[in-house]
Amino acid sequence: MIRLVGALLILLLLCGCGIGSMKRGNLDMDAALLQMAREMREETIGAFMNENCTDAAYLQEAYALSLDERDYALVHAIRSDIWQEAAIFHCNEENWSIIKEKAQVRCAQAKEQGIPSFLGTCGCYVYVLIGEDAQWMRTYLEGL
């Protein structure tokens, strides 16, 4: 099931990356992020997916951020034996430091619980990866 969620996330990332380039700050990436976020919210992955995880309330609770739906994409899957999370935030000059600070806090919380987590940036995007596949996802995103 972890592989299914990971494969879905990669598929969504690949679909979005065909539209533009994060490193070049291509304006089409805004459209790609919006599309990816919408698909993540609409996707049904069964019992593995926590249905309340992709809404603004979870974002506020986990990251202490209030963002418009077009400014983030978030997948969070939790079971008693598995915790996976991938969040991508679109940043601008006004909110860059705030989002990065909140993302660092989220990574630190996961590390305190012994869960692998990584924080990274790519162009005007900040990403947070938490869980077993975090290292693999980090390597993938750094290659974009």
Model-derived features with residue positions:
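Second-shell loop/turn segments in exported
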Residues: 84-93, 125-130
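Positively charged n-region of N-terminal signal peptides that target proteins for export
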Residues: 1-4, 8
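Short amphipathic alpha-helices in soluble, non-transmembrane regions
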Residues: 98-106, 138-144
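Bacterial signal peptide processing site
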Residues: 18-21
